Design a protein with these regions (language model features):
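Conserved beta-sheet core of the metallophosphoesterase superfamily
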Residues: 54, 81-83, 88-147, 151
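Active-site metal-binding loops of divalent metal-dependent hydrolases
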Residues: 12-16, 37-38, 59-61, 87-89, ...
Length: 158
């Protein structure tokens, strides 16, 4: 059984831009999840200087090292199963039946968190270039023995 807590940084849709605000916010994380549309593999190297990284590819990650990332990833952190995919609409499994605690996605550029049947569906929004009126954001998951606490942080508040 896992004792204590784990702080996980969650980002998506960097599209080749890794802001200084992102690097500062992720300091102290024990693991970083990138939910696709990385845009430049050097971003993952810079994130790995902070903590271990689990990343998947998004619809813009077609070439080079980013194109070799998996489409989905199932990872266990702090005794909980987390499933990463870029577009939540493409989810083709039953997270409850699979014992998944958190489904992490990106793609929409809109941060969202929703609990359904005991599963957290978490989208940190986009940490890359601002698109239309969407915020520039990232997320955190704090996992304890008894809870999963999600949080989204707006990096460039108006």
């Amino acid at each position: 059984m896992y004792a204590g807590f784990m702080r996980i940084g969650v980002i998506s849709d960097t599209h080749g831009l890794l802001r200084a605000e992102v690097l500062a916010a992720l300091q102290g994380c024990e693991h970083i999840l990138h939910a696709g549309d990385v845009g430049d593999a050097a971003i993952l190297d810079r994130l790995r200087a902070i903590a271990p990284v689990t990343a998947i590819r998004g619809n813009v990650d077609l070439d080079g090292a980013c194109g070799e990332l998996p489409e989905t990833e199932l990872i266990e952190l702090a005794g909980r199963s987390l499933y990463l995919l870029h577009d939540r609409q493409a989810l083709d499994l039953d997270p409850v039946a699979a014992g998944i605690a958190v489904v992490v996605s990106g793609h929409s550029h809109h941060p969202a968190m929703q609990w359904h049947k005991g599963v957290l569906y978490f989208n940190p929004g986009s940490a890359g270039p601002r698109r239309f009126s969407t915020p520039v954001s990232l997320g955190f998951l704090t996992i304890t023995e008894t809870a999963i606490e999600p949080r989204v942080v707006d990096l460039l508040p108006n």
